């Protein structure tokens, strides 16, 4: 069996490689995906791949496994960066990590090497089960690190080629393995924040592509101007961080795109504005739910799932009814559906209702 392993230079993917070697697989080749364009990096951050590649080389040398660096920079810009920019322009909150997995790691990369390998291995925290050639995506044992949310837009064909060796391990166990076998990167810190940005700061990425434009911050209940901001594209519904005003905490409740206005409420009023019904579209089902029983949803990456019911409407629109209110439902983000620990797929949030 020929196996390709995606290495990031981090501990997780390195332990995933070690796990496959321990299982006796010998025909293995590793790949590092180079995605960011140099002209962007010169403006918005340090080169994110020099240190990565050094660790990839060290890990592959330790295990005597060949590796190759593949440039997917043009594909990444066209399939992920342009999507994020267009969503920000229209006031939506994009989820680029979902499309980085769907369109790059398991899209453009598949297009280049898929036919040559029987299995693609990564260090993602998730599980894939095969029941009589029926593939199921499930949450990882480590619910804090679980990445099924970001894998929700993969197709069954993509999933059938994937293997996630870390799905049954806790992060603490992975660190222990890294130290036990003395991985070169055993003490490397986990990456933080948005995967698709790496070391690049999100606000710097937005500023580079969309610039800044002064606008007013208005209290929703009174209409009073409380301050100014540098562009609606820097804000998302439910956001608290970055609103540098006194007498807070303040939360973003609405964005007026045409007039570049951000509306905010204090914590007391904000908590009264939670929503439990909203519409989604552009659905990707890995496996459709057979009923509404034990159905739950994630509105964002994290541990929390909220029980819900769904109703299929016209034009492939789905109405979602959460059992409890959520306070940061934002158009453009994704709602991911689960039945128990199975990830069924997800859809883009279109608008909130009540």
From Swiss-Prot:
The record marks 124, 333 as: Interaction with tRNA. Residues 145-147 are annotated as: Interaction with tRNA. This is tRNA-specific 2-thiouridylase MnmA. GO terms for molecular function: ATP binding; tRNA binding; tRNA-uridine 2-sulfurtransferase activity. It comes from Borrelia hermsii (strain HS1 / DAH). Disulfide bonds join 100-195. GO terms for cellular component: cytoplasm. Gene3D superfamilies: Adenine nucleotide alpha hydrolases-like domains, HUPs, Translation factors. The active site is at residues 100, 195.
């Amino acid at each position: 069996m020929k196996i390709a392993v995606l290495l990031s230079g981090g501990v997780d993917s390195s332990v995933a490689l070690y796990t496959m070697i321990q299982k006796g697989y010998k025909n293995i080749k590793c790949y590092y995906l180079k995605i960011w364009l140099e002209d962007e990096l010169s403006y918005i951050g340090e080169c994110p791949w020099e240190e990565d590649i050094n660790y990839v080389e060290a890990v592959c040398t330790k295990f005597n496994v060949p590796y190759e660096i593949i440039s997917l920079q043009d594909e990444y810009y066209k399939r992920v960066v342009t999507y994020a920019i267009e969503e920000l322009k229209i006031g939506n909150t994009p989820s680029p990590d979902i499309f980085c997995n769907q369109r790059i790691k398991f899209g453009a990369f598949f297009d280049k090497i898929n036919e040559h390998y029987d299995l693609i291995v990564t260090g993602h925290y998730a599980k894939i089960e095969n029941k009589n050639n029926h593939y199921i995506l499930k949450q990882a044992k480590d619910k804090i690190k679980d990445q099924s949310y970001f894998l929700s837009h993969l197709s069954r064909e993509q999933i059938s080629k994937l293997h996630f060796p870390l799905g049954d391990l806790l992060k603490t166990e992975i660190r222990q393995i890294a130290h036990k076998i003395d991985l070169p990167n055993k003490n490397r810190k986990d990456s933080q924040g948005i995967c698709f940005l790496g070391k690049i700061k999100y606000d710097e990425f937005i500023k580079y592509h969309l610039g800044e434009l002064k606008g007013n911050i208005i209290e929703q209940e009174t209409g009073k101007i409380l301050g100014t901001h540098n562009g609606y594209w820097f804000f998302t519904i439910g956001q608290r961080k970055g609103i540098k005003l006194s007498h807070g905490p303040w939360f973003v409740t609405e964005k007026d795109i045409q007039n570049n206005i951000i509306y905010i409420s204090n914590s007391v009023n904000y908590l009264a504005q939670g929503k439990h019904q909203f519409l989604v579209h552009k659905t990707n089902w890995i496996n459709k739910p057979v009923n509404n029983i034990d159905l739950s949803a994630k509105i964002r990456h994290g541990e929390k799932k909220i029980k819900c019911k769904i109703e299929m409407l016209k034009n492939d629109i789905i109405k979602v009814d959460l059992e409890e209110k959520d306070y940061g439902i934002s158009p453009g983000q994704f709602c991911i559906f689960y039945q128990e620990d199975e990830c069924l797929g997800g859809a883009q949030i279109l608008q909130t209702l009540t």
